[in-house]
């Protein structure tokens, strides 16, 4: 398949229900207009935020308008999601993302890729979500260990006016490492690129599609430099024979894939400005940031077996910028024209929002400054919010020190009142507090592993009551509670079951004789700590350079 670019491209891929058979093939010398719309990393944001940004109601209005435009021009349209529908907004989490899947039905999604956060719950919850969805959830590289069979549909087929489109779903094989090990006892995540090659070759022999799209949840890493993460879209595109994939529509890294130059994304993409997707080995690669902040739109022309991208854009969904006024005050204004909320979507989602808010808008405490939990911070440096979480865990477990993955801190808490919703946004996974007693010599070995997890990954460790120097291989100058580590003394470590079972590649400690799973949910532990110690002084939890990296 030959591609030529007029502007730029994208589409977050995944696939739809299997077609019973292909209709009449495309006609020679006839041009077919095909539009791919896409989103990814929705993470429970079915409702607009407090500033009136994004949300499925405005998304539906936009998508409906585009559908009308495309239909009027005689074209065809697919709407795809790159996965991670689950986890991030308490109103959604408490209802197992039912409002999100039902809302996606109403928007008219054709298919979605399965993301790693679809496994934040037991498989039974994901199976229920499949029932709620009127579109298929796809992944070609997730297998059941006991049967060696795929757990989900690997691809879906679409016939768009005789143009045959296959969409393959792929999930990061990091899922087994970054997800809850308790849920993966009979599940394995195989290498996506290997499975993609097999499926493409199968499709070429059997279905003979004109266009093949990989809907992936693997991440986009500039120039294929994925660090401690599993290889992503760029690496896969380079590893496959040229022409195997026409497009990769991705997610997971939660980036607007808008290239500034070859192999380098724009560092700070401004909503509403031009966006050029990546291209590797003849394959277009796209991603639409996160949370439904954008709908990606790729407009193609297909003629005589050639697919040409004529335009691409990321369309902001009511995103706003903060501007300072002459009187010293500030206001938020839209980057682009406001999109009205669809009444039918509001009617569907309002009961879910009300049910969730009734449980969540309860004040549990207050804080006099921001508690930092932004993704751009907790995966790179020690933060005061992580210290607060760990302080709560230490107090409940009677521990000497505590450790957790930075990726487990999911949001910040602003100064002012703290609600139960705020707590659940920070810790949405429902992990349990665990502890284990270890000799100082064992502690040093443990810290040597976790302290050297790479920055810019969810595994990056957050610490409390620990000071040390990490050099990439080991640790030195280790102190617990400000005192030098005694190799013969017994210390109690508090952490979460996710890490204790080997999540994020941490040493497994669940086999230690002293290991105890308290059964206390992390968010509930944090909630009770805040209630007990409010008003909180944010400065008391501020890191003071205890963790040094060489």
Swiss-Prot record:
Site (Transition state stabilizer): 117, 120
Annotated transmembrane regions: none
InterPro entries in alphabetical order: 5'-Nucleotdase_C, 5'-Nucleotdase_C_sf, 5'-Nucleotdase_CS, 5_nucleotidase/apyrase, Calcineurin-like_PHP_ApaH, Metallo-depent_PP-like
Cofactor: Co(2+)
Free-text comment on the cofactor: Divalent metal cations. Most likely Co(2+).
Binding site for substrate: 375-379, 498-504
Subcellular location, record wording: Periplasm
Binding site for a divalent metal cation 2: 84, 116, 217, 252
Record protein name field: Protein UshA
Taxonomic lineage of the native organism: Bacteria, Pseudomonadati, Pseudomonadota, Gammaproteobacteria, Enterobacterales
Gene behind this protein: ushA
